[in-house]
Swiss-Prot record:
Any one GO biological process: urea cycle
Oligomer and partners: Homotetramer.
MF-aspect GO terms: argininosuccinate synthase activity; ATP binding; protein homodimerization activity
Protein name in UniProt: Argininosuccinate synthase
InterPro entries associated with the record: Arg_succ_synth_type2_subfam, Arginosuc_syn_C, Arginosuc_syn_N, Arginosuc_synth, Arginosuc_synth_CS, Arginosuc_synth_type_1_subfam, AS_cat/multimer_dom_body, AS_multimer_C_tail
Annotated organism of origin: Pasteurella multocida (strain Pm70)
Entry keyword Kinase: no
Family from the record: Belongs to the argininosuccinate synthase family. Type 2 subfamily.
Record flagged with keyword Nucleotide-binding: yes
PANTHER family named among the record's database cross-references: ARGININOSUCCINATE SYNTHASE (PTHR11587:SF2)
Subcellular location per the Swiss-Prot or TrEMBL entry: Cytoplasm
Amino acid sequence: MSNTILQQLPKGQKVGIAFSGGLDTSAALLWMRQKGAVPYAYTANLGQPDEEDYNAIPRKAMEYGAENARLIDCRAQLAHEGIAAIQSGAFHISTGGVTYFNTTPLGRAVTGTMLVSAMREDDVNIWGDGSTFKGNDIERFYRYGLLTNPNLKIYKPWLDNQFIEELGGRHEMSEFLIANGFEYKMSVEKAYSTDSNMLGATHEAKDLEFLNTGIRIVKPIMGVAFWRDDVEVKAEEVTVRFEEGIPVALNGKTFSDHVELFLEANRIGGRHGLGMSDQIENRIIEAKSRGIYEAPGMALLHIAYERLVSGIHNEDTIEQYRINGLRLGRLLYQGRWFDPQALMLRETAQRWVARAITGEVTFELRRGNDYSILNTESPNLTYMPERLSMEKVENAPFDPVDRIGQLTMRNLDIVDTRDKLGIYTQTGLLSISKDSFLPQLNKKG
């Protein structure tokens, strides 16, 4: 068995812990200190919409026994990766055309690399986090951690039998903190678990594991409960501008800071509940899970970007963009966002698709994912209405004689197709009858 994963607490050694300030990591940090480890706490500022005071988290870690505690601002990098995902269409999970924007995988890519980089600065080469053995994050953090520090060792209290035996549940952890002089009041248990960052929120587990429990039990943290009749949502016109694939302006206001742009996009989309979806997905280990997601800003930018893609690029380029995006989305989900095959797909889209995306899209947002596109403008549009106008136009690009020639050339593949269908009929692959959708194939001429 690999010695990369430590199954017992490394006493006397520095252990970095991804510290959220919640019950689990608070109890784990105190327990590790009491059992002889030297814990270092690292907190990622990912712009979580449900976090009120980031600066209080490192202070809390020091109270629980951390040797040192640092707050790492990851927002700029997260915004950068979010834009890269939009540029490359790195989204592979959707239901009925409603997309999940891989916001948790993007957050893990940033957290896993930036926290381990900070640990290296402190000569901390053992890392622990709160991910469980059934989820995706245990593998994502494992990959990103070892990519960033090849000498990294992994210690997770939740894989340590001694920790589980002593502090195996929320009640035990709460009692442990109280017994050690900390006034910890357990929060009221929600009917589901929430994880969030600046790009989006994930609601899953507990009651949401049952498919007969839906979005109506969720209290959005980035938007409104648009499905409720008592929630007023007014229609709103919104304009989004891109320059060379980069979102630069919302409603005429230019943003040089991508973090501020995402925050404003979240506010705009959130007023309507835009970007919420209910998805059944395949986890990395191939078992299916269910999540309800929020991503108002990502959805807003994605709509505008894809509208410009469809108006600027040709059919084959769009097809390749979509195929590559599906593959890239899956790699991102699996924790492979910085693997060579993912970088290849990303750079292809960013170079050959995104660089041409300059323009402005105006649309009307209503409730949830209900919207209408009102206008599309770009100096790079290849959509030219005069080419296919139903009215008579001067200097038409082609005339009836040209189309006759084009149709005549189609005779070649039509004849070939008919011959192939005849072969399939003779071999029994197709059955010809009066009720068949191809009843005339057995007739000559």
